[in-house]
Amino acid sequence: MKAKGLVLLLVFIALLSAKAIGSAKLHKSFAGLTYSTVSMRSSQKITILDGIYKRYSNSEKVVGHRLAKSELSMLSQLVGRIDLSKINDLEVPSKRYRFDGAMLAVIEVQIGQKVYVSVPFDHDNPPSQLKPLADHLSSMHL
């Protein structure tokens, strides 16, 4: 009976430890995030650094504020789904940005001191691996 209780206690402690480690990893997954789009006539840039969201239009700051922990958690999850070591080698579905048929877009993710820069892609047609993050960042008109 004591052995069964001890096993249950150890399983419970292991689960709590795993959750705490996962939670710490989630909140430290990225230090900075940038989503930039540019065409011949305009540019947009979204930066998230130390939990502060800033959006620029044609190099002028439009809005800036601190993100809620839930929003940072969502962004961390989306970033966590991307293989950052291959972010600059992804296959893009279209390249209309080359003749200004679409806005050129790039995503940059900073983890620690390392910055991962995506392959350039059409703003409205990102690579499938970047689509959830790109769509979420594009919809953040806060």
Q: Which residues does each predicted region cover?
A:
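Mature extracytoplasmic domains of secretory-pathway proteins
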Residues: 62-91
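A short, sequence-level motif marking secondary-structure junctions
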Residues: 50-53, 68-71, 120-126
